[in-house]
């Protein structure tokens, strides 16, 4: 890879001069051609005849063509050199800006790229006393390091492409000038990348490393990615990746396996760029249609006769789709087509299963996260989980029937047979949450225990896709700034709450005899946390509470039941509690500090603000006790240690209030309250559930109730300090908030407990 000193100190002037010199040649060749034609050819015409003249004029005609070709070739080389200079100059400028930024932030960048934090504050007591300082410095260092690496990768790819273009013998053995020369670095890199991909599993480790460097450097470049995939074609794309993953899986600790792991990510991100219709150029609808057709075809992945597995194209593609954010125009039809195929034949992905005949796994997902890739639905749903626009369109749109070849069947219906006769698929949410649907173990391992574990990957990916569909961001987005909810998203949340909070919904996620969708409980909790305003409206019936965009119009009974089921998951419990406390704190601040014309006393407004959140907290307390003592799906320590993402959910809960209310508030609520609320949430979840006897007696919420009272009083204290209230008034309002929290928490817990009869 190009080094930092080399790029930083490189004198690019001679390259610019060379480009200018080559750029001047076409005009000179044109002048020579005109002079040759005038002084030689035209001079001889009409004065020389016979066989020798005929042969001479033919030779001179070829010479004239050579002048033309020489001019064309010189112009193209000039453009290539100019492009190289432009790119190198841009990378050099970016590198120098990063080095200046590093110095300004007290980082030292060594010549080998190693970065050392030399901030003098590390030697002061402030550093050790402030954990936030260490986090801030690490984030800056990581960002700087990744950006430096990116610039060097881009410069290296451009350097190698320029070298390959200039070393190419464009004239061939004839030594004649011609026009077969590269005109851009993208064209060179496309040829290099497709040539390696065409070798499939015959490519060397070094060649795969080069392919990865080219793809990674150009993954955001639509001209390169479109050219690469267009030249490779859908069939070869899937064929070469299928054979590479099958080969690499035989040696999971080898360099080759690591190269294929990296290739999976680079192919995914590059495909997302190439299929984005908002970018120019992009792959055509015909290319996309052919990819869908290939998805329903089987691929031979090994010449070994003892290797019987022939995956469908979608089983191969599923591994690539796990990486990248895809446009709905590309990804939604793939998801719809795959459902049509699976509904027509629920055993399609396992009808040629090698399980029971092979000792090793087979994978299209060498990254190893979320299964082996044997079930293509897992990969497709993961792709939707990173593509919120496509996920929303898929889950909120109509069910569309497709022919096997990937084209739409205008008059067709999607009907599925689970052994009790065919029935219509009501919606894609209905399809994936049907209790009779069998989730394919996302592994080819013949070990039955491993296969059983692998059935969790599909439902987990379904949860990820629903998170993206309802939130407008990828499921693994770590920020707090959230887009407002659309009407379609809010409607989908209503359907989800009705589904899992309605009859039979609890059995899907917490059933004692097996819960097929238990792995998606954390995602359902995240959805509730993202819709905390709607949730608090649902449990309280107060439609005046602020929501973030369109309202989900949640039913009270369904909302309570939904929270009770989902809250039994430690991760969901944390997200809901964190968002609830932040949202409630925002409501308390609004009640105490917001401008209002109402004559309702502030104490009553505070009680009203505390009530919905305390009700949610009560349901959560009882749900936690149920998980520990009833369904026995978790231990107290599972809830107590689950605090990594508290800050994210506190920030989102705060934003749901501050970003949605129209009544002015004093200052920036989200800014001043997040740190205090985060501390309060951590204290709230670090508790013990009731004893089993207390749980059986219906008193499993006492510890949680104390925490709800404390957090309500904390909210008043923060809002009071923020609004400049005197100590006595704050104390009185804290008492009011505490009483309301105690009563509402008890009501919420008892309502949840009553569901058990």
Report the location of each language-model feature.
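N-terminal secretion-targeting helices of virulence/extracellular proteins
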Residues: 1-172, 749, 753-757
